[in-house]
């Protein structure tokens, strides 16, 4: 719109999730008119991240080194392994500060419609890891979508001979949630997964 370089900046900002044409233009204009030093710092941080951040060899999350800090931490419980779809899921669980085990990132979920099979995910490495390490409980923390449920079931079948306990995250009523606002599927799951007080 203004110049070819401006248009290129807008185009690249639009690759971010949730950023449309107008938002990308506003961001570009903001960086160029008011925040040039921060824009340069952003460009440098992005360049370094894209060059230096790699996939952890053990858990497949992101790391600055071959093995991420979570996998290197000797205070973590090796008997607990939490399986998630993405590195974003690792960050979400870590923010709760309630889990002290290890992680394994699948790299997505099974989705025949999208052409994603077990061969496209890190499932083979997961089975190998469970066979080699002292994992007593495998926690399946995949999404509650049909694809997430299918992925959890597939993994459960694949590792059942190698792990004592395979569990799934509880599903149901969120904290502070009102029953009348829940969809029937969520409420049904909550009824099936009720617990003792």
Curated annotation (Swiss-Prot):
GO terms for biological process: DNA recombination; DNA repair. GO terms for molecular function: DNA binding; zinc ion binding. This is Recombination protein RecR. Keywords: DNA damage, DNA recombination, DNA repair, Metal-binding, Zinc, Zinc-finger. May play a role in DNA repair. It seems to be involved in an RecBC-independent recombinational process of DNA repair. It may act with RecF and RecO. It comes from Psychrobacter cryohalolentis (strain ATCC BAA-1226 / DSM 17306 / VKM B-2378 / K5). Belongs to the RecR family. It comes from the Bacteria. Residues 79-174 form the Toprim domain. A zinc finger (C4-type) spans 56-71.
């Amino acid at each position: 719109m203004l110049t070819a370089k401006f248009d290129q900046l807008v185009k690249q900002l639009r690759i971010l999730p949730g950023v449309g044409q107008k938002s990308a233009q506003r961001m570009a204009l903001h960086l160029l008119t008011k925040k040039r030093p921060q824009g340069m710092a952003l460009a440098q941080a992005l360049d370094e991240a894209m060059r230096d951040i790699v996939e952890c060899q053990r858990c497949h999350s992101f790391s600055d080194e071959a093995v991420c800090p979570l996998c290197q931490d000797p205070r973590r419980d090796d008997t607990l392994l939490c399986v998630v779809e993405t590195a974003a899921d690792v960050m979400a669980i870590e923010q709760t500060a309630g889990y002290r085990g290890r992680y394994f990132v699948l790299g997505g979920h099974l989705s025949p419609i999208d052409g994603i099979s077990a061969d496209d995910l890190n499932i083979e490495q997961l089975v190998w890891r469970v066979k080699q390490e002292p994992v007593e409980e495998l926690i399946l923390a995949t999404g509650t979508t049909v694809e997430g449920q299918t992925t959890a079931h597939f993994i459960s079948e694949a590792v059942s001979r190698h792990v004592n306990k395979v569990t799934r995250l509880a599903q149901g009523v969120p904290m502070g949630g009102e029953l009348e606002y829940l969809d029937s599927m969520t409420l049904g799951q909550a009824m099936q997964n009720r617990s003792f007080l």
